[in-house]
């Protein structure tokens, strides 16, 4: 982990804890927390192989429709069933997810302080009476899951904003780290679709705001305001993860070409500007705003202007992580064959 990555992790942890001891301007807190989560997630996504889950163009086109169906389903569940019952089921579901997400987030930092064999030697646990069901884990993962268990218990029992944010930030970092758009074309399709999705469900229906207020699970970050009438400002995790995976793609594009953060800087700046404009407009009109309305043009616009300015539209549009992975595999196979011949 490089110095700037370690500094970003420490800054994110400090900013999350700061409202416990000092009053932090919630608008500034929203922007800094979201940007730091994106920054950390992007750098964690840079690996020898692309992230494990790659989105296709077809998936990107269907995503707003699937998201709309899920959003409407939740709205109807809260409307016709007991709110406490729905949230109890969701809490149980996110309890498991939260432990896994926080474990995966903390593991790289914790591994450095544990014996090597704890990181390498896997333990296989088979379920009683169902031996086909097995789980493989290391002792390091067990250690890393302890804080996750603590925060999930705390959240389930108290619904404290800090426990909510720790789990929410973990979901954001893991989402950005593990998900790949594959190409900028797929990213543009996804962001454009969710641009209209966000506008429709926020401006033209009460569904989005109603679900956000009723959904008692770590799917949004909460920022204390000190105002009894409106105790928290909030930001949905989707407003961090969705643009974040596009920004991460820009960083990996830079790395693949051996250049230093050129397009990443543009995409990250676009995200920061878009989120800042969201906060300004929200405070001006004193009403909820679809954040992607401002973030999507910021991210795509800054990257588009940058590549047009440099005359690099073609390499940007032709970049495909799946093809790059296949080419690397072919090169490795060729090298290994040549080495065998030489031997």
Swiss-Prot record:
Its EC number is 3.4.23.-. A motif (Endoplasmic reticulum targeting signal) lies at residues 340-343. GO terms for biological process: membrane protein proteolysis; signal peptide processing. Keywords: Endoplasmic reticulum, Hydrolase, Membrane, Protease, Transmembrane, Transmembrane helix. It comes from the Eukaryota. The chain crosses the membrane at residues 20-40, 63-83, 88-108, 137-157, 161-181, 189-209, 231-251, 267-287, 291-311. Residues 1-19, 84-87, 158-160, 210-230, 288-290 are lumenal. Residues 41-62, 109-136, 182-188, 252-266, 312-343 are cytoplasmic. It is found in: Endoplasmic reticulum membrane. Residues 322-343 are annotated as: Disordered. GO terms for cellular component: cytoplasmic side of endoplasmic reticulum membrane; endoplasmic reticulum; lumenal side of endoplasmic reticulum membrane. The active site is at 198, 239. Residues 324-334 have a biased composition (Acidic residues). A motif (PAL) lies at residues 290-292. It is a multi-pass membrane protein. Belongs to the peptidase A22B family. Intramembrane-cleaving aspartic protease (I-CLiP) that cleaves type II membrane signal peptides in the hydrophobic plane of the membrane. Catalyzes intramembrane proteolysis of some signal peptides after they have been cleaved from a preprotein, resulting in the release of the fragment from the ER membrane into the cytoplasm. The first transmembrane domain may act as a type I signal anchor. The PAL motif is required for normal active site conformation. This is Signal peptide peptidase 1. It comes from Oryza sativa subsp. japonica. The gene is SPP1.
């Amino acid at each position: 982990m490089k110095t700037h990555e370690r500094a970003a992790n420490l800054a994110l942890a400090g900013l999350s804890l700061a409202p416990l001891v000092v009053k932090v301007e919630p608008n500034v807190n929203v922007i800094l927390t979201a940007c730091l989560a994106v920054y950390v997630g992007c750098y964690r996504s840079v690996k020898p192989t692309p992230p494990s889950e790659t989105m296709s163009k077809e998936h990107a086109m269907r995503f707003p429709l699937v998201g709309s169906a899920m959003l409407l389903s939740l709205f109807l569940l809260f409307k016709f069933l007991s709110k406490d019952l729905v949230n109890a089921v969701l809490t149980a579901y996110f309890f498991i997810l939260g432990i896994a997400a926080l474990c995966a987030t903390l593991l790289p930092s914790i591994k450095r302080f544990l014996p090597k064999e704890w990181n390498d030697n896997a333990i296989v646990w088979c379920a009683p009476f169902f031996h086909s069901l097995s789980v493989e884990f290391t002792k390091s993962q067990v250690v890393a899951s302890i804080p996750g268990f603590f925060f999930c218990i705390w959240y389930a029992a108290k619904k404290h904003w800090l426990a909510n944010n720790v789990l929410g930030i973990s979901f954001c970092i893991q989402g950005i780290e593990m998900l790949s758009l594959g190409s900028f074309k797929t990213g543009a399709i996804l962001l454009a679709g969710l641009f209209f999705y966000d506008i429709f469900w926020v401006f033209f229906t009460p569904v989005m705001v109603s679900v956000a207020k009723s959904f008692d699970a770590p799917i949004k970050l909460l920022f204390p305001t000190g105002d009894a009438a409106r105790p928290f400002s909030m930001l949905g995790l989707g407003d961090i993860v969705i643009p974040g995976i596009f920004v991460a793609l820009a960083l990996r594009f830079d790395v693949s070409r051996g250049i230093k953060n050129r397009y990443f800087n543009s995409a990250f700046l676009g995200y920061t500007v878009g989120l800042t404009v969201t906060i300004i407009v929200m405070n001006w009109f004193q009403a909820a705003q679809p954040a992607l309305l401002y973030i999507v043009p910021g991210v795509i616009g800054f990257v588009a202007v940058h590549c047009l300015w440099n005359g690099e539209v073609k390499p940007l549009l032709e970049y495909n992580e799946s093809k790059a992975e296949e080419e690397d595999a072919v090169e490795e196979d060729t090298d290994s064959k040549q080495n065998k011949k030489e031997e």
